[in-house]
Amino acid sequence: MILFIFEGKDAEPRLYKTLKELFHFELPEEEILHYFCNNIFSLYNTIMSYSDDENKNNPFEDIDIINVLKEDAFANHKKCEGLDKIKHSYEVSEIFLFFDYDIKPVDSFNKLSIEQQNERISMLLSFFNSTEIGTERAGIKLFINYPMIESYRYFKCPLPDENYKDYTVNVFIDGAFKQKVDDFCDYKNTKFLCYDMNKSDELKKSKDEDRANIIKQNWIFIKEMNLKKANFICTDSYSFPESKEKITQQNILDNQIEKYVNRRKEIAILNAFPLFWFEYIDETKLLT
């Protein structure tokens, strides 16, 4: 089984299922979708609550992420039909997580400095992007949207938007980013960017072939823009990355912090789904 863990239960699965339908993503095993329904720092706190306090070098060592998620879902009354299909952790060969950067200013609710928040995200990346769970291609990978999942439609003109590499927002924009996207985006709705979902979380496929072709072409542009932007963040070259090693999630975070957060208190707009597509789906197609 391959487990997908999404921060939210609306935009993320909608995008993933649209891309899978249009580009025929072929996964080697059955997929399971789970919605965490909380932010990346809640994920950190949840995992830490199961860690061994005596192990200061690697507090996440020996954490069974699947059992942690099951217990979290039960304790917080979250739907977990997908997780219920997993009887034993060893049944899952790969896990992919998609979360927002979601940095917040220090206030009465958040006591963590921006440096402490970045440190926690870096710890999660280190844990998820190096942990193996038992099989040859197995592992866990965390992908981060900057600043949020809605970054997938942050463009000002009809695609492709050649100015995409320069788009940034204030690092503390938080939930206001959604309204900013609505005001900024050339498309005022998502009709030509993704399909809708029904009440059963199933994709409502369009019978309009022209619409399907437009969505598909738009995502080819979005993929290209985000791959070039990731490479620009990491290497200062707005071009296709020479390899996936150039634009690892850790490299992206480190360069976001150094070049944007620390210098300008900004974050460069970047969406995680094209990076997952490039890093995993394209490679999987080559292997099959």
Please state what every model-predicted region is:
Residues 17-34, 44-288:
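C-terminal accessory helical subdomains adjacent to catalytic cores in phosphodiester-
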Residues 2-23:
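Short, acidic loop-beta-alpha module within alpha/beta folds
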